[in-house]
Structure formats: C-alpha cells, structure tokens
From Swiss-Prot:
Keyword Cell membrane in record: yes
Any GO molecular function: octopamine receptor activity
Family: Belongs to the G-protein coupled receptor 1 family.
Extracellular side: 1-57, 113-129, 194-218, 430-441
Mode of membrane association: Multi-pass membrane protein
Bias (Basic residues) ranges: 299-315
Organism the protein comes from: Bombyx mori (Silk moth)
Protein name: Octopamine receptor
Length: 479
C-alpha cells in the first residue's frame, strides 16, 4: 500500500516536471523562430540575411540616409539664406531639421550595419551611447513637431498678442526646453535604469532596455504625451480656422450691406478742403496708413485700425504731381486687418483753423503689408476698389492660414503613421513574455520611424512655396 502510494507519488512528480519542461522547451522553440541564423557570404563575413537581400537592404537604407541628410541640410540653409524664410518661427523648423540630421548621421549608419550583420560588433560602450543618441534624437524630433504645433496654434488663435510675444529669445527658450527634455528622457539608462548585461559578448544583442518602468516613462515622454498634445492642438486649430472663416463671411456680408447705405469717397486734396486724403511723405515708410473719410448726412462714422506709430504726413495740394494717385502704405500683422475699436463721434467743423485736427479724428485707417498705388477713378469706383483690395488680402491671409494648418496636419499624420507601430510594440514587449517577434519585423517598424526624419523636408517642399523656391535656388534650378 505504502509502496503503491510511493510509486504514484513518484509518477505524479515525474509527470509534473515533464509537463513544465515541455512548456519551457515549447517557449524556447517559439522564440527561436524569431532569431535569424548567420549566413556566410562571399565577402568572408557572416550575415543575418542572404547576400542579395543584404545588398538590397544596404542600398535602400543608404538612400534613406542620404535623402535625410540632404533634405534637412537644405531646410537649414534655406532658412538662413532665403530672406522670406528668415523669420523667428522658422527656428523651430531649423531645430527639427537638426534633430532629424543627427538621427541620420549618428544613429542610422550603425543601424544599417547591425541590421545586415545580425550582431553588434562595436562593443558595449558604443552600444550604450548609440542607444542613448537614438532615444534623444528621435525624441527631440517628435518634441520639435509638438513645439511647431503649439506655435502655430498660438499664432492662429491669438495673432495680435502672440506676434508681440514671439521673440527670438522666447523661441530659443522653447527650443532649449525641447532638447533638455529629450536629454532627460534618454539619459536614465546610462545612470543605471536598465537591464543591460554586465558582460557583453559578440553575440549579445544591443537593444533598448526593456525595464518596464523606463519603457513607460520614455514612451510616454517621447511619443504618447506629444501625440495627445498635437491631437488636441490640431483640433483647436481646425476649430479656430473654421470660426474665422465664418466670421470673415459675416463681415463681408455686413460690409456689403453697409456700403449700400453709407457713401464713402476719396477727395482730391485741396488746401481749403477739410476732408482731404493724407499720406506718408515717403511711400517706403510702412508704419502708418492712408486715411479715408466716411461722409454721412448727419454724422461722421469713425473706425480706427490703430498702428503703433503715427508717421509724419503731408497734405497734398492741387499742384502736387502725385495727387492723381492714392498711395496706401500697408502694415500687416499675421497678414490680416484687425478691428481694434470703433467710435462714433459728431464733429463740428465750423472754422478752417481746426480743420487738420478734425481731419485727424474723422478717418478710417487701413493697414496692410506693402505699398499699393491705386490709379485715380471716379469716387465710388475708387472706394469699391479699396474695399475689394482689403477683402482680397483678407482672403489670401486666411488661405495661407488654412494651408499652414493643412501642412501641420499632414506632418502630424505622417508622424503618427511612422512612429505609432514602433511605440506600440516597444510598450507591449516588456509585459508580454511570450511575444517573440522576428528581427525583420522589428527592423521594419524601427526604420519606419526613422523614415519620418526623411519625410519632413519633403512635406515642406511640396506644401510650402517659399521652401520650394529656396530649394531650387540652392540647387541652382531655374524657377
């Protein structure tokens, strides 16, 4: 009885160990499928893939590296050499191009060798620095996209105030924050937050740490938080642009109705005429605006678009050779005309001595981007031409805003397509022990993320006329 019991117990124990052993072996077999064998080639080195595949892979990846380097260098040179692009907000694009350029120079070449050879032959210290640069440069590229989205959001939703706040110091400060955050996110593995082996053999894989805490920390800071910010910001940009379209349509409708009720005219200058048209003595000075007089039977309607400074003005006389032209110096903020205030006042113009003071009060100031000359026409036609000109400039301004928002949306869409697969796998692997993916698949989603650094300059070239012209100029291509 006791012997039978012992036999049954031994049997039970034996069966249990056998089952556990079989499960372990099965898991090893499953993961072993993911490991690519080293294949000898005619060059005398071992490859992770067949020779023809290694050659094709090397050619394709080298082309990606070259296009990334050339494209981002062109972006940087364009901003510094092409005058229309030499504006403060484009320093964000320069920072993005620098991040993408460092990815192409410091990260991609070693990854090409690692992908083809199937083993890391550069030592443990190069491995650690390479992985750190990989995280830092890719994070910087993503955070720069986030900064560009925020900059565009503030420029569209609060153009007047943000135009004053958007100084070189502020932009450089934001860029500095981007790079500091990238360094903070990428450096913890160097300080001990890793699961790297202490002894690094030739066949030891050089991989990102799979420490769960760091994976959550780095993936959140590098991708998921910026993704949420960019999604919210882009949605707000869409709503703001849509609202401005509706407001612009309403304003156009109101101005059309009011133009039928009130009679606006521009008069030739006359020394004795109180309602003369004033302009800058020098048409190259863009700080002020021409003033038009609004006449009504009972009272003058005054509507001001105030500039920062009042330039020196002169009143034209009949002997002035230029009195047949209406010169409108234009000063624009964000390429649009903004109503700052509206005031209705009744003015008595009883004497000629105070006619200039009255003229200063009962005027409409119009500001825009460049000096424009309008030939003398009949009074009503002149007024219609001025308002048509303003409406056209407003329409062009809004078109530019929509185009910039669309470009930002395309950049964000490409960013999500390129990086989302990698960060999903990166976040899942530490928590899924039985998930064994092939090296080819890992290399594919990794390089899909790297391709984002090559696509950003192409997006600028396709959707931005100024960058397109700058690229042609740098490449000596006649427009």
């Amino acid at each position: 009885m006791g012997q039978a019991a012992t036999h049954d117990a031994n049997n039970y124990t034996s069966i249990n160990y056998t089952e556990i052993y079989d499960v372990i072996e099965d898991e090893k077999d499953v993961c072993a499928v993911a490991d690519e064998p080293n294949i000898p080639c005619s060059f005398g080195i071992s490859l992770a893939v067949p020779e023809w595949e290694a050659i094709c892979t090397a050619i394709i990846l080298t082309m990606i590296i070259i296009s990334t380097v050339v494209g981002n260098i062109l972006v940087i040179l364009s901003v510094f050499t092409y005058k229309p692009l030499r504006i403060v907000q484009n320093f964000f694009i320069v920072s993005l191009a620098v991040a993408d350029l460092t990815v192409a120079i410091l990260v991609l070449p070693l990854n090409v060798a690692y992908s083809i050879l199937g083993q890391w032959v550069f030592g443990i210290y190069v491995c650690k620095m390479w992985l750190t640069c990989d995280i830092m440069c890719c994070t910087s590229s993503i955070l720069n996209l986030c900064a560009i989205a925020l900059d565009r959001y503030w420029a569209i939703t609060d153009p007047i105030n943000y135009a004053q706040k958007r100084t070189l110091e502020r932009v450089l400060f934001m860029i500095g924050i981007v790079w500091i955050l990238s360094l903070v996110i990428s450096s913890p593995p160097l300080l001990g937050w890793n699961d790297w082996p202490e002894v690094f053999e030739p066949d030891t894989p050089c991989r990102l740490t799979s420490q769960p805490g760091f994976v959550i920390f780095s993936s959140s800071g590098s991708f998921y938080i910026p993704l949420v910010i960019m999604t919210v910001v882009y949605f707000e940009i869409y709503l703001a642009t849509k609202k401005r379209l509706r407001d612009r349509a309403k304003a156009t409708k109101i101005s059309t109705i009011s133009s039928g009720r009130n009679k606006y005219e521009t008069k030739e200058s006359d020394p004795n005429d109180q309602d003369s048209v004033s302009s800058d003595a020098n048409p190259n000075e863009h700080q002020g605006g021409t003033r038009l007089v609004a006449e009504n039977e009972k009272k003058h309607r005054t509507r001001k678009l105030t500039p920062k400074k009042k330039p020196k003005r002169r009143y034209w006389s009949k002997d002035d050779k230029s009195h047949n032209k209406l010169i409108i110096p234009i000063l624009s903020n964000e390429n649009s005309v903004t109503d700052i205030g509206e005031n209705l006042e009744n003015r008595n113009t009883s004497s000629e001595s105070n006619s200039k003071e009255t003229h200063e009060d009962n005027m409409i100031e119009i500001t825009e981007a460049a000096p424009v000359k309008i030939q003398k026409r009949p009074k009503q036609n002149q007024t219609n031409a001025v308002y048509q000109f303003i409406e056209e400039k407003q329409r062009i301004s809004l078109t530019r805003e929509r185009r910039a928002a669309r470009t930002l949306g395309i950049i964000m869409g490409v960013f999500v397509v390129c990086w989302l697969p990698f960060f999903v796998i990166y976040l899942v692997i530490p928590f899924c022990v039985s998930c064994c993916l092939s090296n080819k698949f890992i290399n594919f989603i990794t390089w899909l993320g790297y391709v984002n650094s090559a696509l950003n300059p192409l997006i600028y070239t396709i959707f931005n006329m100024d960058f397109r012209r700058a690229f042609k100029k740098l490449l000596f291509i006649k427009c």
